[in-house]
Amino acid sequence: MADITEVQYIWKNGEMVPWAEATTHVLSHSLHYGSGVFEGIRCYKDPDSDKSFVFRLQDHMERLHRSAKIASIELPYTVEELCAATVEVIRANKLPSCYIRPIVYRGYGVMGVDPSGAPTDVVIACWPWDAYLGPDALAN
């Protein structure tokens, strides 16, 4: 487990918003009924150049789309748009390497088991995160 290091921006519903403004209401449908999907992705800096690479970004976003479909959540962005938004938020935060968390969930507006009418919120956050299992993970 690692603490989250705040960065400047989060991509939310097609816009780059300041970290502190990327909030979700406590009565959002997903918070009460678990109606959401997410991915966990890594971006790595190439040690031999000044370039960074997102690991299997297209595959992750395709899986996010499939997961949303299985959960009956209509995702309002294409795979290509989500990939572009991911690169955009990494660049906006000037992160050479990071953890990326895209999440799709039903937002605030309706309550009850039937999610009809609940808006779909899409967020892509990223932040610095070293080795997932800690600095000694590879050695041990």
PLM region descriptions:
Residues 1-140:
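Conserved alpha/beta cores of soluble small-molecule-handling proteins
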